[in-house]
C-alpha cells in the first residue's frame, strides 16, 4: 500500500514527519533514484528510498514503552561524557524518540517510541496534550488556594516566555501540589513556583497524554499494553 513519503519516513523511525518534509524540500531524498517531491507516495516494501545517499530500511516493528526516569538522567539522544542518559536504562539499542522530556533534576514518566510521527504529535505544543506532575516543596505553603488560583489564571515567568498557565493546580497536603500542564516551557513549573519564592524539592511526572506511570519502579521500563497504544494512536 502506498502512503505519503513523509509519513512513511516517520513510520520507519528515521525522523518525524516535519523533519522529513524539510529533507524533501532540501532535495535530500530519492525514490527509486529520482529526487522526491512533496506529495509523493511510496510503498515501503517495494520502493527504494534513499536519504542523503543511504537506503531507508523498511518499516520496523513498532515499539512503544514507558520509563520511570530517575533524577540525574538526561533525556536527549546526544550523549555527553560523564553524564547519565535514560537510554542507558533501556536494553533496546534501536533509535527511539523520547516523548515528554524531563530535565535532569526531575523524575517520572517518559514515553519512548520508534514511531516518529506519533512522537511529534505527542511532543509538539500545538496539540496541547496534558501532563500531570506531583510537586513537593521545601517551604511551608501558607496560601495554597491563592497559589492554585494564580497558576490557573496565569503567571509571567519572564525570559521572553511571558504568561503561562496551568490547566489544573490542586494542593494535597504536606506541601505537595498536583500540577497539570498542556504546554511545556523550559523548567516551567520550577519557574512558576519561584514566582512565589518557593523551592521544589521533588518534581515527578505521573501522567502524560492520558497514560499513567502507576507503580512502575524507578529506573525500570515496560512496554505499553494494547489499550494504551490504541489510545495514543487515536488521539
Regions inferred by a protein language model and the residue ranges of each:
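Basic, flexible Lys/Arg- and Gly-enriched helix-loop patches that mediate nucleic-acid binding at interfaces
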Residues: 2-235
Amino acid at each position: 500500500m502506498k502512503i505519503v513519503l513523509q509519513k512513511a519516513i516517520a513510520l520507519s523511525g528515521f525522523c518525524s514527519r516535519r523533519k522529513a518534509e524539510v529533507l524533501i524540500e532540501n532535495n535530500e531524498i530519492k525514490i527509486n533514484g529520482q529526487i522526491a517531491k512533496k506529495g509523493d507516495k511510496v510503498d515501503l516494501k517495494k520502493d527504494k528510498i534513499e536519504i542523503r545517499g543511504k537506503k531507508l530500511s523498511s518499516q520496523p516493528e513498532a515499539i512503544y514503552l514507558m520509563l520511570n526516569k530517575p533524577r540525574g538522567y538526561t533525556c536527549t539522544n546526544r550523549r555527553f561524557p560523564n553524564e547519565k542518559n535514560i537510554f542507558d536504562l533501556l536494553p533496546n539499542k534501536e533509535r527511539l524518540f523520547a516523548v515528554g522530556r524531563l530535565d535532569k533534576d526531575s523524575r517520572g514518566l517518559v514515553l519512548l517510541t520508534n514511531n516518529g510521527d506519533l512522537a511529534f504529535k505527542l511532543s509538539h505544543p500545538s496539540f496541547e496534550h496534558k501532563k500531570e506532575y506531583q510537586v513537593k516543596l521545601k517551604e511551608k505553603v501558607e496560601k495554597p488556594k491563592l497559589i492554585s488560583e494564580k497558576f490557573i489564571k496565569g503567571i509571567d515567568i519572564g525570559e521572553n516566555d511571558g504568561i503561562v498557565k496551568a490547566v489544573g493546580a490542586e494542593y494535597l497536603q504536606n506541601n505537595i501540589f498536583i500540577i497539570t500542564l498542556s504546554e511545556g516551557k523550559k523548567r516551567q513549573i520550577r519557574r512558576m513556583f519561584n514566582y512565589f519564592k518557593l523551592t521544589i524539592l521533588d518534581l515527578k511526572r505521573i501522567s502524560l497524554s492520558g497514560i499513567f506511570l502507576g507503580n512502575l519502579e524507578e529506573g525500570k521500563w515496560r512496554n505499553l499494553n494494547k489499550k494504551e497504544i490504541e489510545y495514543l494512536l487515536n488521539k
